[in-house]
Amino acid sequence: MAKKSKQLRAALEKIDSTKAYSVEEAVALAKETNFAKFDATVEVAYNLNIDVKKADQQIRGAMVLPNGTGKTSRVLVFARGAKAEEAKAAGADFVGEDDLVAKINDGWLDFDVVIATPDMMALVGRLGRVLGPRNLMPNPKTGTVTMDVAKAVEESKGGKITYRADRAGNVQAIIGKVSFEADKLVENFKAFNDTIQKAKPATAKGTYVTNLTITTTQGVGIKVDVNSL
């Protein structure tokens, strides 16, 4: 514990808490100040000036990072017949119907993404209390309720991330791993930022991005200059 505190203090000394950094500077600092003994995840956290109580200001979606996330996602697909075969051929880790529902209801959760064809949603709906709180429930807005299961599986395996603004307008997302080259992390960030900027509601007033930080697992949040975006 003492060693960790010492590492945290050392990291804090390298970061000026009164300064807002460029994206390139923030990424470099995130890599430099990371003290986790594993390949830590690099994340971004936005605070958006939106009112999610208004239907037209809810932000939710998905995108594929150009350089992936550095994480191999375990993909589960609810499908039958030809669509089930397509999912398997595309690399889905688990494909099924009632058998998977029973398994999940028994406590099994060894998967990261859930995809379903539209006709399976009545069945998948039974798992709402389990999947919903874990943000695993398939949704058309994130491309996880679809007839094109092969594409959905391939994207999920190839760096697809989902995002959603919470009640306070906060949006968090993974942009890669500490082991990534800095320019790859910057490229991923810029791709995600473009997505967030394009998602700005037409009715949102004032400054859209009010705060933005980049951090690593167990790391220190590094403030990014929103005016540089």
Curated annotation (Swiss-Prot):
<dbReference type="InterPro" id="IPR016095">
    <property type="entry name" value="Ribosomal_uL1_3-a/b-sand"/>
</dbReference>
<keyword id="KW-0820">tRNA-binding</keyword>
<dbReference type="InterPro" id="IPR028364">
    <property type="entry name" value="Ribosomal_uL1/biogenesis"/>
</dbReference>
<dbReference type="GO" id="GO:0003735">
    <property type="term" value="F:structural constituent of ribosome"/>
</dbReference>
<dbReference type="InterPro" id="IPR023673">
    <property type="entry name" value="Ribosomal_uL1_CS"/>
</dbReference>
<keyword id="KW-0678">Repressor</keyword>
<dbReference type="InterPro" id="IPR005878">
    <property type="entry name" value="Ribosom_uL1_bac-type"/>
</dbReference>
<dbReference type="GO" id="GO:0006412">
    <property type="term" value="P:translation"/>
</dbReference>
<dbReference type="GO" id="GO:0006417">
    <property type="term" value="P:regulation of translation"/>
</dbReference>
<keyword id="KW-0810">Translation regulation</keyword>
<comment type="function">
    <text>Protein L1 is also a translational repressor protein, it controls the translation of the L11 operon by binding to its mRNA.</text>
</comment>
<keyword id="KW-0699">rRNA-binding</keyword>
<dbReference type="GO" id="GO:0015934">
    <property type="term" value="C:large ribosomal subunit"/>
</dbReference>
<comment type="similarity">
    <text>Belongs to the universal ribosomal protein uL1 family.</text>
</comment>
<dbReference type="GO" id="GO:0019843">
    <property type="term" value="F:rRNA binding"/>
</dbReference>
<dbReference type="Pfam" id="PF00687">
    <property type="entry name" value="Ribosomal_L1"/>
</dbReference>
<protein>
    <recommendedName>
        <fullName>Large ribosomal subunit protein uL1</fullName>
    </recommendedName>
</protein>
<comment type="function">
    <text>Binds directly to 23S rRNA. The L1 stalk is quite mobile in the ribosome, and is involved in E site tRNA release.</text>
</comment>
<comment type="subunit">
    <text>Part of the 50S ribosomal subunit.</text>
</comment>
<keyword id="KW-0689">Ribosomal protein</keyword>
<dbReference type="GO" id="GO:0000049">
    <property type="term" value="F:tRNA binding"/>
</dbReference>
<dbReference type="InterPro" id="IPR023674">
    <property type="entry name" value="Ribosomal_uL1-like"/>
</dbReference>
<dbReference type="InterPro" id="IPR002143">
    <property type="entry name" value="Ribosomal_uL1"/>
</dbReference>
<keyword id="KW-0687">Ribonucleoprotein</keyword>
<keyword id="KW-0694">RNA-binding</keyword>
